[in-house]
Amino acid sequence: MGFSTADGGGGPGARDLESLDACIQRTLSALYPPFEATAATVLWQLFSVAERCHGGDGLHCLTSFLLPAKRALQHLQQEACARYRGLVFLHPGWPLCAHEKVVVQLASLHGVRLQPGDFYLQVTSAGKQSARLVLKCLSRLGRGTEEVTVPEAMYGCVFTGAFLEWVNRERRHVPLQTCLLTSGLAVHRAPWSDVTDPVFVPSPGAILQSYSSCTGPERLPSSPSEAPVPTQATAGPHFQGSASCPDTLTSPCRRGHTGSDQLRHLPYPERAELGSPRTLSGSSDRDFEKVSPSEQGPRMPPENCGGSGERPDPMDQEDRPKALTFHTDLGIPSSRRRPPGDPTCVQPRRWFRESYMEALRNPMPLGSSEEALGDLACSSLTGASRDLGTGAVASGTQEETSGPRGDPQQTPSLEKERHTPSRTGPGAAGRTLPRRSRSWERAPRSSRGAQAAACHTSHHSAGSRPGGHLGGQAVGTPNCVPVEGPGCTKEEDVLASSACVSTDGGSLHCHNPSGPSDVPARQPHPEQEGWPPGTGDFPSQVPKQVLDVSQELLQSGVVTLPGTRDRHGRAVVQVRTRSLLWTREHSSCAELTRLLLYFHSIPRKEVRDLGLVVLVDARRSPAAPAVSQALSGLQNNTSPIIHSILLLVDKESAFRPDKDAIIQCEVVSSLKAVHKFVDSCQLTADLDGSFPYSHGDWICFRQRLEHFAANCEEAIIFLQNSFCSLNTHRTPRTAQEVAELIDQHETMMKLVLEDPLLVSLRLEGGTVLARLRREELGTEDSRDTLEAATSLYDRVDEEVHRLVLTSNNRLQQLEHLRELASLLEGNDQQSCQKGLQLAKENPQRTEEMVQDFRRGLSAVVSQAECREGELARWTRSSELCETVSSWMGPLDPEACPSSPVAECLRSCHQEATSVAAEAFPGAGVAVLKPHALGKPWASQQDLWLQYPQTRLRLEEALSEAAPDPSLPPLAQSPPKHERAQEAMRRHQKPPSFPSTDSGGGAWEPAQPLSGLPGRALLCGQDGETLRPGLCALWDPLSLLRGLPGAGATTAHLEDSSACSSEPTQTLASRPRKHPQKKMIKKTQSFEIPQPDSGPRDSCQPDHTSVFSKGLEVTSTVATEKKLPLWQHARSPPVTQSRSLSSPSGLHPAEEDGRQQVGSSRLRHIMAEMIATEREYIRCLGYVIDNYFPEMERMDLPQGLRGKHHVIFGNLEKLHDFHQQHFLRELERCQHCPLAVGRSFLRHEEQFGMYVIYSKNKPQSDALLSSHGNAFFKDKQRELGDKMDLASYLLRPVQRVAKYALLLQDLLKEASCGLAQGQELGELRAAEVVVCFQLRHGNDLLAMDAIRGCDVNLKEQGQLRCRDEFIVCCGRKKYLRHVFLFEDLILFSKTQKVEGSHDVYLYKQSFKTAEIGMTENVGDSGLRFEIWFRRRRKSQDTYILQASSAEVKSAWTDVIGRILWRQALKSRELRIQEMASMGIGNQPFMDVKPRDRTPDCAVISDRAPKCAVMSDRVPDSIVKGTESQMRGSTAVSSSDHAAPFKRPHSTISDSSTSSSSSQSSSILGSLGLLVSSSPAHPGLWSPAHSPWSSDIRACVEEDEPEPELETGTQAAVCEGAPAVLLSRTRQA
C-alpha cells in the first residue's frame, strides 16, 4: 500500500507518513492493549483491509474504516464492561482481545476453513463514516460464510451466553459454540463461555488473604454474603498467556442491588457463577483448540505482558486503561520464576511488526497456511497462573468507558475540574459515545447544574465535547458511581426472550402484518470489506401481547399510544421524560425498543406501513440515553418503523440537531409548533390537548382483547389440525380395520367438540365481544383491533362447521367401505369353498397339474446350477484378467533396467507361465461371448484383449532388462508368441494407414514397414512419418500386397532400401537451424500412389512430382487453397513430398514404449487441460442460459436493443464447438497426451472464431461500460454470483492464453525424449496456431484503424504480420508502421489519439508480386531491403530496420515464403497454360552447367520464350568477393489474369554491393526455395512502439515520399523485369 503526499520529496511527505503511522498505532494500541502482543495480528488485518477495500490508501483507510471502527469497538467495550465496574481486568483489552489473542477481528479470516459450530466476530464498514459488528459463521450449504449483523442495542449483551442462544435460535441450524481467536499466524478455537468470562486482578489485600488461606484446603463461601469486599474473581477458563491467582479468590458483590435483583437480568452472570471461585489450574478441561500452522513456520512467541512493556499513548492517555503492576514479593515460591512474557524468552525471529510502516515494508501472511487442530497445552496456563501470585500482572486493565480514564485515587471533584465544558480534545468523555446519537449531543447550558446534581458523579456532565447528549443529558450512563475503578456502568440492556433490535442503519425489516419481523439477514458473505449491511436485524419474536413487554415501563405511562393520528394519518406515540423511571439502572434500551415495536404492531396495516410519529416531551427534563438509542435503532432501518421524531424542548433551550446526524428529529420549542404536525384535538391532556385518554383503561382493554384473540387463534389452530388428521388416514383392507377406524373417528370428534377452550368460546364468545364493544375506547386502533377479534371469532365458527361437515362425510364413507369389505370377504370364502369342492370331484386333473409344476421347478433348478457353474468360471477368468492387468505396472519404459525391476519382471513371468495353457481357450470363448451373461462383463473383455499384448511386452522387457539364460527369450517361445499374434489378429482391428482428413480420430498410429530391410517408414501426405504402434506384430508387406496397386508399391519399397543414403526423419523433427536446401537429396526418385486412396492421386493436380537426375523437386501449390498456418511453421511448401528412406535401426519395443506410456507429468497436464475445458464450457453455458434471455426483456435499455451480437459476439458458436467437438477430442487424447497437437491442428479453422471474438471484444466492453453493467447487475444479484458479466465475457480470451501455456508445458515435457519428431512438430505447430489467434485479433483491430487507404484490404489475402520499422529511402528516414498481407505490403504512419487507440495514416502500398528482397543489409543484423522491378534508381529501394533481430528474421522468413509461393503458383499456371495451348508439358528438364560458374546450374523447361542463363549475368553476382557464392536457381512466372505479363521472379543468393542491384538479370525459369532461417514460431506484434526516444529523434520529419509505381501497373517488355531475392548485401 502506498500513501500519496503533497510533496514528492523526502521532507514533508516522509513526515506525513510518520504522522499517519503514529496515528494508526495510537488508535490500535488504544483498542487492543497490550499493543506489543497484538501488533502482529491487528496491523496485518488492517493492512489487508487497506489493500482490498481502499486501494492501498492508508489515509482513506484510517478515516473511512479505522476511526468509525474505533467508535463502534469502544461502544462495544463500554457496554460489555459496564456490569463489572469496580473490578480491574487482567486483560485490559477485554472483550476485544485477551492479551495476544484478538477476539474482534478487523478483517475476514479468508484462509481459515470454518467448521460447523465455528464463528468469529468482525467489525466492518457500514456505509459512510460508520462501522458495524457482524458475526460470521459457516453458511447453511457449507460453501461459504454468512454474516449476522449485531444490532447496536445488543452490544451490552454480546459477550453473554444469552446472545449466542439468541443467534442459534434465529439460525435454526447447527448451533454455534466455538469462537475463533487469532494470534499472529495461529487461529485458536475457544468455547464461547471462555470468551465471555473475564479475568480480574486481585487487590493486594485479597492476595494476602488468599495467601494466608493457602495452607489449608480451599473453602467456598457458603453464601454470597460471606464473600469479602469486591476484589477479584476469575470467571472461567482463560486464554493462553493470561495470569491468575492459583488460590481461592472471592467474587464481588454487586453494589446497590440485592441478589434477587441481579438474577432477573439475563445478560449478567448469575450470582452463583460469580461467587464460585475459579482458578486457572482448574480450567484445563475447557482449554482452547488451536489452529496453528506449526509445520510452516515458528509459533508466535508470547509477548511481554508485564506492565513495564506497555507504552502509554500520550494522545489517548485518558482513553487508555490504566496499568496496575504489583512488584511486591509476597513470599510465594513461584514468584521468583520467570514469567512467560519475559523478554528473554522471546525467539530471535520477530513475527509482529512494530509499526504500520514496517508492516507495509515487510508484510506477513495471515491465515494462508494449512489448518491443524490441536489442544493448547495446559502447561502454559499453569505457568501463567503462577505469575498472578507474585503480583506481576499484565499491563493494562479493563475497558474503554464513556468517561475519561483517571487515577483510581482521584476524587470526583478532581475529575470535575479536569473535564470542563471547554475541553474538546480527543481524550474527552464524549469521544467514546455511540455514533448513532450525534444529532442529540448538544446540551442546553442552563440545565447543566441540575444534570450534574442528578448524576452520581460529575465526569459524565455536559461539555466534554459537543456530542453525546439528548436534550442536555449525557447519552452515557445516567447512573454512575465514583471513580474508584476504571469503569463506569451503562444501563442494563435486558435481553428477554427475543431481546433487541438493530440500530444499524438500513438493517431493520418488518413485513409481517401481524407484527412478527424477519430474522436477522444471513446472506452468503461476499468476503470483502465494506459490504453493504443486510436488512432484517430484528429478533424473530416481536411482542404480540401487552404481557410480553416490560410491565413497569408500560404501567408508568411514560410511553403511550393513545390512538391519535397526525395530520397525515400516522399513529402518534407520546414519550414523557419527566419520570424517575429513566434514572433507574434497569431502564434499558431493549425494553423501550420492544415496547415501541409492540405499539407499531397495533394499528392496521395501512397505518403501520406509514410509520410512527414519536413525540418526545423533553421539557424541564432531558431525554434519557435509552430513548435516544432505541429511537436511533428504529429510525435507521429500511422498514418505516419510525417515520419522524418531534422533540419538544423549552424555549430557552439551545439544543439544535446536527446536519450530519444519523437520527433525524424535528425540534419544536412550543406547543403551537407541535400543532403544525399534530392537531390539538389529537393530543392528550399532558400536551394541553383535548383528546380523552386513560392509560389504565387502555391497558385493561388491550389485555382483555388480546386474551380473547389469543384464545380464538389457538382454537383455530386446534380445529385446523383436527381437520388435517381427518384427511390423513390409512386405507383399511378388512371389515375389522374399517370398524376400528370408525371408532377412532367418533372418539376424536367427541374429544374435539368437548374441548374446554372451544366450548367456552362458543358459549361465552358473543358475550365477551359485546362487553368489548361496550368498553371500546373510541379510537381507530381500538376499532380496528376489535374488528380483527370479531373476524377471528367468526372464523372459529366457520372452522367448527367445516370440521363437522367433513367428519360426517368421512363417517358415511367409512360405513360404505365397511359394507363393501364385508361383501368381499364373503365372496372370498365362497370361492375357496367352491375350489375345494371341484378338487374333490376331479382328483386326477389336480394330480397332473402338480406333476407339471414339479417338472418346471426341476428345470429351473438345473438351469440355476448351470448358471452357478458359469459364474464360477467367469469369476476365475476375471481374477486371471486382473492378474494380467497388474503386470502392466512394472513395465514402465521410463524405469531403468535395475535389479529390482528385473526381479519384478522375473516374478511376473513365472506367474504367467504358471497358468495352464489349456485354460485359455475356454476362457477366451467365455470372454468373447458378451451375450452369454450380459453387459457387465464388457470390461473383462477389454482386460482379456490386453493379455497377449501384455505377455509379449513382459517377455521383451525381461529380455532387454536382464538377459538370463534361464528365461526363454521371445524367439525361443514360439507357442506363446503365436498365441499372442493370433489373439491380436482375431480381436484387434486391422491396421489402418493415417489420413489427413479432418474428421479422423484423435490418434491413428501408423505402421512400420518391418518387413523391409532396415524397417523403412512410410510417409503420409503432409510429410508425416507413420509411427509404429501396437500392431507391429503383423507383416506390413503382406498387408500392402492386398491393397490396390500393391505390386508397384512393394517393388518401390524394396528398391528404396538400396538407394537410400540417410535415415528418415519427419520434417518437423529435423534440426531447424540447417538450411532447407539440405533436404534436397541427390537420389533416384520415384512416385508412389497412396495405398488407401487407389488411383485418386494420379489425377490430383496438387501433388505434381518432378524428377530429374540427381535432383528431386515436388510442388504442391497448384491450387488457390492457402496452406494452414501450422504448415507454414512446420515446413516450407516444397517439403510435401512422398519419399521412402530407411531409418537407422529403431527398436520396435523402444518405439512402442515411447508412444504408449507417457510420464505422469504429461498425464497431469492433459488432465488439467480436460478439467479446465469442462469448466470453460460450463461458464459459457452459464452465460447463455442466464444472460442471453435478458436481451429479450421488455425493459431492455434503448442503447442495448438489437446489440445482442455486439455484446456477446460469437460466444454461442464457441460454446457449441467446444462442447460438441473439441472436448471429445481432448478426452480421446487423455491417455496419449502427445497426440493433442493433432487435435489443435485439425480444428485450426474453428479456432479462427477466436479472432472474430477478439476483434469484437472492444465494442462489447464499450457497450457494457456505457449501458450494460447497470442493467446486468440486477441479474447478477439475483443469481448470487460474485463475478459480473464482463468477467465471463473475458473467459474466451483467457482460455486461448491457457491453451498456449498448457502446450508449452507439454512441449517442455515431451522434449525430454518421450515424443517422436512428428509429435514434437505437431505440438510446436499447435502452439503457433494458438499464439496466432491471440495476436491476430489485435492485428485485425489495427487493420481497421488504417485511415485514408484507397485499396480494399479485404481482397489482399490474410494479414500475416505488422510492425514498426525505420524505413530508409535514399537519404531520408521515416518511422513507419508496416502491414504485410499475402498480396500487399502497406506503409503507414502512426498517429497517437489521446484517450483512444492509435490510428494509422496510409502512405503507400505495393503488390508483393512486384517486390524483391535482400535478406541482410549491413552488419547490424537488423536491416533488410525491399526493391521493385529493375531498380533504375536508388529511390526504388527501401531499407527496413527492425527493432530486434527476431523481428527481422520473422519478417524475412514470411516475405520469402510469400515470394516463393507466388513463384511456384505462377509456374504451375504457366505449365498448365502451355499444355492447353499445345506446346506440351515436359516433366524432365536438362541441367546444363556453365563453364564460368561451376557451382551454378541452369534448369530449362524447354518452353519457348523462356529466358536461359546467358552472358547477361553480371560478374558481380557470379564472382562476388565480399560474400560467399552459393547455387542459384530462377523461376519464371507470368500473371495471366492481368493484361500485362507478370514479371519473372528471379531468386539469387547474394549481391555484393548496392550497385550490383542495378545489374541483376534473369537466371532461369525453374526456382527452388532455399530459405535461410527456420519458420518463426510466432510473430511479435507490438502493443507499444519498440523504438526509444533517441531513435525517434534521429528519424527525419515526415516528408512527401517519391511516388513509386505500384504492382498494379507493371511495365510491358519482352524481357520481363525480374525480382531478386538475395541473401546479403553490404550496406
Curated annotation (Swiss-Prot):
Residue ranges of the region described as Disordered: 211-349, 381-475, 501-537, 959-1008, 1049-1111, 1124-1159, 1519-1558
Any single Pfam family the record assigns to this protein: RhoGEF
Composition bias, Polar residues: 241-251, 1057-1068, 1101-1111, 1133-1144, 1521-1535
Gene Ontology biological-process entries: axon guidance; cell-cell adhesion; regulation of small GTPase mediated signal transduction
One GO location term (cellular component): basal plasma membrane
Compositionally biased intervals (Low complexity): 1545-1558
Domain remark from Swiss-Prot or TrEMBL: Subjects to autoinhibition, mediated by the N-terminal domain.
Name by which UniProt lists this protein: Pleckstrin homology domain-containing family G member 4B
Species per Swiss-Prot/TrEMBL record: Homo sapiens
The gene coding this protein: PLEKHG4B
